[in-house]
Amino acid sequence: MAHIEKQAGELQEKLIAVNRVSKTVKGGRIFSFTALTVVGDGNGRVGFGYGKAREVPAAIQKAMEKARRNMMNVALNNGTLQHPVKGAHTGSRVFMQPASEGTGIIAGGAMRAVLEVAGVHNVLAKAYGSTNPINVVRATIDGLANMKSPEMVAAKRGKSVEEILG
């Protein structure tokens, strides 16, 4: 159990959105809350979670636990991306491209939170279409998952990294 707590201490956690939803029943309305969170180690591991509960703290806790369970690795290149990438989920489309040192994270809203916890320090990013936070987060993670490192490309093609980089 101590190992899990130590690991959780290393993770950065960000709350992106809390939403109140209602269900109308015969006796009135029943309110419920949803929370969207992202967690990352700041070094290429990132995950997101979506939790629902009757109370806000419970929804946030559920979302954090789901985010920790759904973590994936992202191949970064000195705090930026390997190459320009696109990601999409339903009506949201995102475009991200690597940026030079000192640029910072030029991205809005939900995208910025994902990139910060993933450990990306310099990136130019733009969200197109729907800016629904859930879909933007999913599209951003889709784009990061589609990114390939030179080592991955070299292994796939059966060539050396030097041949790939030219």
UniProtKB/Swiss-Prot annotation:
Pinpoint the S5 DRBM domain residues. Answer: 11-74
Report any one BP term from Gene Ontology.
translation
Q: Does the keyword Zinc-finger apply?
A: no
Xref: InterPro entries: Ribosomal_Su5_D2-typ_SF, Ribosomal_uS5, Ribosomal_uS5_bac-type, Ribosomal_uS5_C, Ribosomal_uS5_N, Ribosomal_uS5_N_CS, Ribsml_uS5_D2-typ_fold_subgr
Coiled-coil portions? none
Residues annotated as signal peptide:
none
Task: Look up the record and report any one GO term of the cellular component aspect.
Answer: small ribosomal subunit
Reply yes or no: does the keyword Zinc-finger apply: no
Keywords from the UniProt entry = Ribonucleoprotein, Ribosomal protein, RNA-binding, rRNA-binding
Q: Which SUPFAM superfamilies match?
A: dsRNA-binding domain-like, Ribosomal protein S5 domain 2-like
Task: Offer one Pfam family short name for this entry.
Answer: Ribosomal_S5
Q: Which Gene3D superfamilies match?
A: 3.30.160.20, 3.30.230.10
Q: What Gene Ontology molecular-function terms does this entry list?
A: rRNA binding; structural constituent of ribosome
Q: Which family does it belong to?
A: Belongs to the universal ribosomal protein uS5 family.
- NCBIfam families, per the entry: rpsE_bact (TIGR01021)
Describe the task this protein carries out.
With S4 and S12 plays an important role in translational accuracy. Located at the back of the 30S subunit body where it stabilizes the conformation of the head with respect to the body.
**Annotated domain remarks:** The N-terminal domain interacts with the head of the 30S subunit; the C-terminal domain interacts with the body and contacts protein S4. The interaction surface between S4 and S5 is involved in control of translational fidelity.
Subunit record text: Part of the 30S ribosomal subunit. Contacts proteins S4 and S8.
What is the protein name for this chain?
Small ribosomal subunit protein uS5
Question: Encoded by which gene?
Answer: rpsE
